[in-house]
């Protein structure tokens, strides 16, 4: 049976479903067919997801769009019932590049508008990935242009730190509705989450499973899927450890972005609304924090506006 996530209201009055399907292919093997993205999107909509997250840099917007189109054609959903997020890449940060970049994404997605457009990183790069010195405040002007043109219903950012969020809010007439950042048990981001929420900016959480899902990194900090704290919660609520971690984020007021191409797991990852963790259980998971990221962006550490 399909399970639909509740929605919350953003600071611009629009609403957003509180679970999104992630479509980034960072852990995909070269042998994996990109068509699995189209199939995953279709299965997700079939399972009740109404929020799909993608990005220009994922190079799968066409497949995301195909999955959406197929679901609409088969009567599973209407466009208006869906919430689609995509992101501006680092080499399109000049104000006059933003709207054309979004138009290119819309063309690939087969959509007339995007529900949420994000600046993927505060870092600007040239096409060869060398550093550029474009201020993200200029980029935000282009994002505001996109919203005024009706191409993006809502606009926000991703991977911004607290100082950058404060500076952006102080120098813009449209406040970002979202900061999408990595949040999981080993990277709980409590100060940044609290800062965003205090400004009325919602937080989307990517890499929600952290290192609990084996990623093959040596020296990665705990917990793992057999951790006693997590397995006790899974047994108590009759859920998987993955579902416990997603519910942990929801109970912190966050919007998790689980990623899967497995039909059963896609459905499992939204089956989160018949239980709730206690304050003490959320606090116990917070204790795993090591400020250790799954997604390593340190290659850009010497670039202007690196969000350390």
UniProtKB/Swiss-Prot annotation:
Its EC number is 1.1.1.-. Keywords: Lipid metabolism, NADP, Oxidoreductase, Steroid metabolism. Induction: Up-regulated by the insecticide diazinon. NADP-dependent oxidoreductase with high 3-dehydroecdysone reductase activity. May play a role in the regulation of molting. Has lower activity with phenylglyoxal and isatin (in vitro). Has no activity with NADH as cosubstrate. Has no activity with nitrobenzaldehyde and 3-hydroxybenzaldehyde. The active site is at 58 (proton donor). PANTHER family: ALDO/KETO REDUCTASE. InterPro entries: AKR, AKR2E, Aldo/ket_reductase_CS, NADP_OxRdtase_dom, NADP_OxRdtase_dom_sf. One of its GO terms (molecular function) is oxidoreductase activity. One of its GO terms (biological process) is steroid metabolic process. NADP(+) binds at residues 22-29, 53, 158-159, 215, 259-269. Detected in hemolymph (at protein level). Detected in larval ovary. It comes from the Eukaryota. This is Aldo-keto reductase AKR2E4. Subject to substrate inhibition by high levels of 3-dehydroecdysone. Pfam families: Aldo_ket_red. It is an enzyme of class 1 (oxidoreductase). Belongs to the short-chain dehydrogenases/reductases (SDR) family. It comes from Bombyx mori (Silk moth).
